[in-house]
């Protein structure tokens, strides 16, 4: 279907299309997603399902997406701890060794830049790409900076976190954080800390994929005035 017809159909059946942005070989739709549909429609796959429903198409899964039956012996699972299962309902992590940090391929750069996301490096870009594709935020830690296990817990009064954009935040006990055995590594579901960020010489990473209580995360973002 043509771009205008797609926008008109979404406006009538699902969401408000605020802007159509033509690119050289693609088109970007700026779509307003209401809070009650954020869980399934803030990612490109979810929006693709919605479009298939609107136009009577069958959604075709990406053949490049594969589920591994076994985990390679070089991929090691780190210990993960959840202190409050209401605040963090699920927390998964895996360690990957032997990575090489560098530029992302051009196709990924273009896709991220098309939606206003600056390319940083192949590791960070991959986590951002998954977030926008699947509506599943992820985060990567430099494994060298993690002492012990990853833990989803509430901050201790007076703890301080320096975020990736060099902002020092004084935390309180209502703030859910990701920490290791000795220090805070990031604001859960919002922003990582600078100390554990991916560096050019990083060779081992910990990938985080977790589900946090959304109201708690929203309040934390408002409290510290952080929008990501």
Task: Enumerate the predicted regions with their spans.
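RNA/tRNA-interacting regions in translation and RNA-turnover enzymes
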Residues: 1-228
């Amino acid at each position: 279907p043509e771009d205008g017809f797609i926008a008109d159909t979404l406006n009538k059946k699902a969401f408000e299309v605020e802007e159509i942005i033509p690119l050289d070989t693609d088109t970007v739709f700026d779509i307003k997603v209401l809070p009650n549909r954020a869980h399934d429609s803030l990612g490109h796959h979810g929006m693709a399902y919605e479009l298939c429903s609107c136009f009577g198409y069958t959604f075709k899964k990406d053949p490049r997406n594969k589920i591994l039956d076994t985990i390679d012996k070089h991929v090691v699972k780190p210990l993960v701890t959840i202190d409050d299962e209401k605040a963090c309902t699920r927390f998964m992590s895996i360690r990957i060794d032997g990575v090489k940090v560098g530029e992302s391929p051009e196709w990924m750069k273009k896709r991220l830049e098309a939606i206003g996301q600056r390319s940083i490096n192949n590791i960070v870009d991959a986590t951002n790409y998954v977030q926008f594709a699947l509506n599943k935020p992820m985060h990567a830690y430099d494994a060298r900076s993690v002492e012990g296990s990853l833990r989803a817990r509430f901050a201790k009064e007076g703890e301080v976190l320096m975020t990736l954009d060099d902002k020092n935040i004084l935390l309180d006990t209502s703030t859910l954080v990701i920490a290791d055995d000795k220090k805070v590594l990031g604001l859960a579901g919002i922003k990582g800390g600078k100390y554990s960020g991916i560096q050019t010489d990083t060779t081992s990473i910990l990938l985080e994929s977790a589900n946090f209580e959304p109201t708690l995360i929203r309040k934390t973002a408002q409290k510290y005035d952080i929008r990501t």
